[in-house]
Amino acid sequence: MKIEKPGNYTVSDGEDVEVFGTGEGVVIIMTGGVVSTWDSSAPVITMTGGVVSTWDSSAPVITMTGGLVRTWESSAPVITITGGYVRTRDSSAPVITMTGGEVWTLDSSAPVINMTGGYVWTWDSSAPVITKI
């Protein structure tokens, strides 16, 4: 599915979604599948499993159970995952909250990382608060 205008979108299991240059007001709800955004504002992405990839995009709320979040030169201020994997490069991800899983940052700003278990890896990054239980 290709999204080029704001709206609410419910995506069938396993379907890929591409969001190109849309304004605010995009809501994506998925079970599995892939979400990719380019130069876009996708303020709400809710997934069970699957993959979220953002490039030069603003995705202020990403909520996942499992799966993978990838950001590149993007702003993703709130990422909440149960399990799964977060990877940021040249990105701003000021709040990452995980139960298990892995956080990986490169040349990124991730000032708050809260994890129960899991793994945190940073390189040339700003992560002033890391809390692991």
Question: For each predicted feature, which ranges?
Answer:
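Extended beta-solenoid/beta-helix repeat architectures
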Residues: M1-I133
